[in-house]
């Protein structure tokens, strides 16, 4: 029997606010345990929540960027369950009236575009964290309790692990472009639960789903979904039944393992939180937030195609992150050579950043410095080979490309007399190759170019070298 996978994602986006969703405590990651807490975080008697307005604005931004409708009135609800890192005995979330509804994202699937529906986006608080000790005991760190989250719930529209990863990357790109999430997946700022089921091909009835909790990398999401699909298919083929449950992915072994039975909504006994009034969002508020939205990735991609005449591949790479796009654009506007700027940013710069584990925001070579280097190439002052050496110097020592070229005497030689002398000497020393070229062996030409450049220590103008060589070798 052939099976069709059905996949839906619930993505938790940690918002980049200075303070928590219902109190003024810091959201800074990595503080000493229980340092960033207060009576609200600790659920002490009489402590009341006060909603952080910035969280609502970030939620509106996310909704607009994912083509959702914004609910004019939405309420917070208590999601009741017991866990040691949940001090109140409930989580403040949203249920019946979330802030964003009925959106979508379009993803690339091969040469086609597929639309993935977004059921809802709602605001909620994060729980604390259990810290397991070596002696068998566990501590509770409530620094994270009350950190603001958006939960983005997709429709079950994905049919492969690759589609799920494409959707996840698109959403990640959007929330980081918006500046509402730092995107640090290792710290849990962007993580997802994957709901996976399988059904016979041609069937219109979804199978029983399993939820894979808290997967925090694109690689692991793909691996977890692929394993779970294979597990369910094998189970059904062997005569078993898929149980609705929550599972965890073990990245070391590449398998999912049962964690607990999957709860339904009624198990959480949702009801409106009496300590929080409904949030009313006016049209004027939505318009103001919309006017403040940054240029989104898809719009920027299309603009790079038209404004800078870039190939689709270049535009796609350069708009993959907002800092990368900003760096390229500053460089291109300064040097007036967009294609060269794209090549250097995607080539030498990205390679150096990756080799040294540095984010582009912290690049030792600024857009202006790189633009200065490109101008020297375009002006014929240095060759591409010399430019790479100058870039290395800029990376290590800073400064300006023009000053480095002058100080180190790296300007390329365009003097025909000096180049002709080098060509004559090389031809005289390699008459066999000269005869081969004149006999029709064109590939030998590259040998002569290399020898001349070597003799001129890489400083000869390649265009002048080519022209003079052709004349000399023609006899």
UniProtKB/Swiss-Prot annotation:
Gene3D superfamilies, per the entry: 1.10.10.410, GatB domain, N-terminal subdomain
Keywords linked to the UniProt accession: ATP-binding, Ligase, Nucleotide-binding, Protein biosynthesis
GO biological process, one term: glutaminyl-tRNAGln biosynthesis via transamidation
Entry GO MF terms: asparaginyl-tRNA synthase (glutamine-hydrolyzing) activity; ATP binding; glutaminyl-tRNA synthase (glutamine-hydrolyzing) activity
Reaction(s) the record says it catalyses: L-glutamyl-tRNA(Gln) + L-glutamine + ATP + H2O = L-glutaminyl-tRNA(Gln) + L-glutamate + ADP + phosphate + H(+); L-aspartyl-tRNA(Asn) + L-glutamine + ATP + H2O = L-asparaginyl-tRNA(Asn) + L-glutamate + ADP + phosphate + 2 H(+)
InterPro entries for this protein: Asn/Gln-tRNA_amidoTrfase_suB/E (IPR017959), Asn/Gln-tRNA_Trfase_suB/E_cat (IPR006075), Asn/Gln_amidotransferase (IPR018027), Asn/Gln_tRNA_amidoTrase-B-like (IPR003789), GatB (IPR004413), GatB_C_1 (IPR042114), GatB_Yqey_C_2 (IPR023168), Gln-tRNA_amidoTrfase_suB_CS (IPR017958)
Subunit structure: Heterotrimer of A, B and C subunits.
HAMAP family per record: GatB (MF_00121)
General function of this protein: Allows the formation of correctly charged Asn-tRNA(Asn) or Gln-tRNA(Gln) through the transamidation of misacylated Asp-tRNA(Asn) or Glu-tRNA(Gln) in organisms which lack either or both of asparaginyl-tRNA or glutaminyl-tRNA synthetases. The reaction takes place in the presence of glutamine and ATP through an activated phospho-Asp-tRNA(Asn) or phospho-Glu-tRNA(Gln).
Protein name stated in the entry: Aspartyl/glutamyl-tRNA(Asn/Gln) amidotransferase subunit B
Organism classification: Bacteria, Pseudomonadati, Thermodesulfobacteriota, Desulfuromonadia, Geobacterales
Gene label: gatB
């Amino acid at each position: 029997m052939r099976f069709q996978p059905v996949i839906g994602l619930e993505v938790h986006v940690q918002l980049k606010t200075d303070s928590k969703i219902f109190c003024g405590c810091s959201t800074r990651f990595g503080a000493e345990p229980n340092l960033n807490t207060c009576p609200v975080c600790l659920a002490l008697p009489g402590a009341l929540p006060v909603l952080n307005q910035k969280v609502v604005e970030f939620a509106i931004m996310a909704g607009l960027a994912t083509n959702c409708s914004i609910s004019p009135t939405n309420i917070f609800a208590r999601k009741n369950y017991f866990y040691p890192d949940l001090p109140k005995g409930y989580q403040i979330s949203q249920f019946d009236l979330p802030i964003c509804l009925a959106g979508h994202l379009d993803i690339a699937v091969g040469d086609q575009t597929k639309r993935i529906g977004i059921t809802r986006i709602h605001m909620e608080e994060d729980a604390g964290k259990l810290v397991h000790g070596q002696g068998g005991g566990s501590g509770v760190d409530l620094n994270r309790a009350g950190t603001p989250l958006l939960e983005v719930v997709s429709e079950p529209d994905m049919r492969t692990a690759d589609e799920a990863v494409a959707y996840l990357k698109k959403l990640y790109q959007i929330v980081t472009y918006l500046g509402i999430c730092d995107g640090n997946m290792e710290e849990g700022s962007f993580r997802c639960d994957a709901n996976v089921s399988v059904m016979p091909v041609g069937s219109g009835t979804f199978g029983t789903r399993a939820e894979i909790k808290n997967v925090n990398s694109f690689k692991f999401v793909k691996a977890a979904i692929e394993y779970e699909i294979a597990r369910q298919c094998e189970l059904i083929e062997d005569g078993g039944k898929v149980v609705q449950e929550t599972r965890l992915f073990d990245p070391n072994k590449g398998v999912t393992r049962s964690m607990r039975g999957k709860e339904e909504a009624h198990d959480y006994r949702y009801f409106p939180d009496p300590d929080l009034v409904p949030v009313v969002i006016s049209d004027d508020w939505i318009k103001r937030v919309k006017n403040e939205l940054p240029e989104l990735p898809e719009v920027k991609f299309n603009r790079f195609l038209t404004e800078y005449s870039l190939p689709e591949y270049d535009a796609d790479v350069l708009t993959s992150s907002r800092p990368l796009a900003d760096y390229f654009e500053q460089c291109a506007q300064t040097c007036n050579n967009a294609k060269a700027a794209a090549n250097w940013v995607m080539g030498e710069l990205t390679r150096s950043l990756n080799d040294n584990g540095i984010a582009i925001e912290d690049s030792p070579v600024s857009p202006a410095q790189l633009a200065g280097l490109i101008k020297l190439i375009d002006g014929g002052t240095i060759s591409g080979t010399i430019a790479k050496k100058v870039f290395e110097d800029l990376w290590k020592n800073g400064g300006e490309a023009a000053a480095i070229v002058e100080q180190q005497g790296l300007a390329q030689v365009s003097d025909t007399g000096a180049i002709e002398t080098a060509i004559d000497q090389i031809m005289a020393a390699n008459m066999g190759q000269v005869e081969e070229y004149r006999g029709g062996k064109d590939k030998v030409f590259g040998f002569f170019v290399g020898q001349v450049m070597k003799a001129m220590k890489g400083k000869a103008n390649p265009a002048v070298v080519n022209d003079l060589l052709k004349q000399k070798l023609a006899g």
